[in-house]
Amino acid sequence: MKILYSPRRFYPVETLFNGTLSLGGRDQETTGFAWWAGNARLINLSGKLLGAHVAHAGLIVFWAGAMNLFEVAHFVSEKPMYEQGLILLPHLATLGWGVGPGGEVADTFPYFVSGVLHLISSAVLGFGGIYHALIGPETLEESFPFFGYTWKDKNKMTTILGIHLILLGFGAFLLVFKALYFGGLYDTWAPGGGDVREITNLTLNPNIIFGYLLKSPFGGEGWIASVDNLEDIIGGHVWLGSICIFGGIWHILTKPFAWARRAFVWSGEAYLSYSLGALAIFGFTACCFVWFNNTAYPSEFYGPTGPEASQAQAFTFLVRDQRLGANIGSAQGPTGLGKYLMRSPTGEIIFGGETMRFWDLRAPWLEPLRGPNGLDLGKLKRDIQPWQERRSAEYMTHAPLGSLNSVGGVATEINAVNYVSPRSWLATSHFVLGFFFFVGHLWHAGRARAAAAGFEKGIDRDTEPVLSMTPLN
């Protein structure tokens, strides 16, 4: 096969390290990369790069299966999931597996099955990765032209993009089918404190679905993270799955337009940078979603959101003091504002005290107590149910910020020794990973653009400070 360009021409990164270590001819001299540069050595070896990708997928799936079984083995049914440091079982419970009313786990067998299936899948992927890395053809273009490619082949690249989009679309529809036909999903808003239910009345109105994208990300608007019902979530997956599938078909059947051919850099490193940029956006979006949204990420499994824990504290003390005879409608706090209840900027009745900054919170344990003008004083006096009291007391003491009390918003009693909320773990990890993916995007985009412009020189090692230092040995 004729290679369209020399990897050493485009990627002449020099290193101080010993370049003699090689594997199957993939050494620094022939590839332009030292052994520790990993998959960069395989840029023009499509068969070996396939092996690396399949093996990587196997590692990911192996972790999922092993961690899944680890959590099942340590699961205690008497305690809520968020108190046990679980990060995978909450996802399975949200999908409706093994849970019943109120989010109580009735059966852990589906979780065990999930773990075993992932382990078996990882073994298949692992064998495939080893085969393609060590035994299979180095390049696919000669033996399997459908799977072969060159990075500069714009039409082939958009065809591969199309195939990926179709697979993503099918993934979105898997959730739709689970919600509609295979047992439903856990709905935290189901009457009486949440339950598993099949979704029957999808929201397919494009004005509603795409209206989320046009919302402000600030305050009570909340962009797409403000979705508060499963009908909109599943309807959104129908739209997204359809767009991905039709977009994939479009990219397979068409060739890139002239403007696209001119606008993009067409090289392996450029595609890597585009992918990292997309993953960074996904990570930042997931961070906001898991931190603020208690519909897609039910508080029964992930623990309360920050605003939810704060409002739960106000509600818990309101219930206590009302039983002791306090008049919650007129009592004043030390600032002269309402101690238990006050008015929001838009005139609604909200909880008083410091939690007023979270006045636009919506939570299933609190919504039944609202009326047309915010919290209903009559309902607060007569209609509070025991399950609402229990849940708010539980959420009050399990804030994702790791704090029960605070002064002016500064935490004073950090409780992060015996309890860290899975919501905190997931939000923080996705933000940090999203940030590093974004930095990787900038790094590889800069290298790809420089290589395309012809001035990528690598790092100048002649003036490297380490050269003037005494050798370690």
Curated annotation (Swiss-Prot):
Binds multiple chlorophylls and provides some of the ligands for the Ca-4Mn-5O cluster of the oxygen-evolving complex. It may also provide a ligand for a Cl- that is required for oxygen evolution. PSII binds additional chlorophylls, carotenoids and specific lipids. The keyword S-adenosyl-L-methionine does not apply. It comes from the Eukaryota. This is Photosystem II CP43 reaction center protein. The modification Phosphothreonine is found at T15. The modification N-acetylthreonine is found at T15. Belongs to the PsbB/PsbC family. PsbC subfamily. One of its GO terms (molecular function) is electron transporter, transferring electrons within the cyclic electron transport pathway of photosynthesis activity. It holds the Pfam family PSII. One of the components of the core complex of photosystem II (PSII). It binds chlorophyll and helps catalyze the primary light-induced photochemical processes of PSII. PSII is a light-driven water:plastoquinone oxidoreductase, using light energy to abstract electrons from H(2)O, generating O(2) and a proton gradient subsequently used for ATP formation. The chain crosses the membrane at residues 69-93, 134-155, 178-200, 255-275, 291-312, 447-471. One of its GO terms (cellular component) is chloroplast thylakoid membrane. Keywords: Acetylation, Chlorophyll, Chloroplast, Chromophore, Manganese, Membrane, Metal-binding, Phosphoprotein, Photosynthesis, Photosystem II, Plastid, Thylakoid, Transmembrane, Transmembrane helix. PSII is composed of 1 copy each of membrane proteins PsbA, PsbB, PsbC, PsbD, PsbE, PsbF, PsbH, PsbI, PsbJ, PsbK, PsbL, PsbM, PsbT, PsbX, PsbY, PsbZ, Psb30/Ycf12, at least 3 peripheral proteins of the oxygen-evolving complex and a large number of cofactors. It forms dimeric complexes.
